Amino acid sequence: MANIKSSEKDIRRTKRRNAANSQNRSRLRTQAKKILKAIKEKDPKAAMALFIEYTSFLDKAAKTNLIHSKNADRKKSRMAKRLNAVFAAA
């Protein structure tokens, strides 16, 4: 238990940030799943629209240090590879 006012405030701030970060991480995972579902259903338009949203959100997450920038780049690259592999053959 914190005894100092600034420590109490730090605890409140940490709870708020933790909630926001977990919500954003969950959103990242959900978006990735939606893209994979669109790929599985062979829907290129939906997959590309979702991919654009996903890359934008990854960039924002990297910018705010939710994930590392190289992690974001790797996720974008791997998802783009999957999209190209499925829809280039079609």
Curated annotation (Swiss-Prot):
Keywords: Ribonucleoprotein, Ribosomal protein, RNA-binding, rRNA-binding. GO terms for cellular component: cytosol; small ribosomal subunit. It comes from the Bacteria. GO terms for molecular function: small ribosomal subunit rRNA binding; structural constituent of ribosome. Residues 1-29 are annotated as: Disordered. Signal peptide: none annotated. GO terms for biological process: translation. Pfam families: Ribosomal_S20p. Residues 1-11 have a biased composition (Basic and acidic residues). SUPFAM superfamilies: Ribosomal protein S20. Gene3D superfamilies: Ribosomal protein S20. HAMAP family: Ribosomal_bS20. Belongs to the bacterial ribosomal protein bS20 family. Binds directly to 16S ribosomal RNA. This is Small ribosomal subunit protein bS20. It comes from Leptospira borgpetersenii serovar Hardjo-bovis (strain JB197). The lineage of its organism: Bacteria, Pseudomonadati, Spirochaetota, Spirochaetia, Leptospirales.
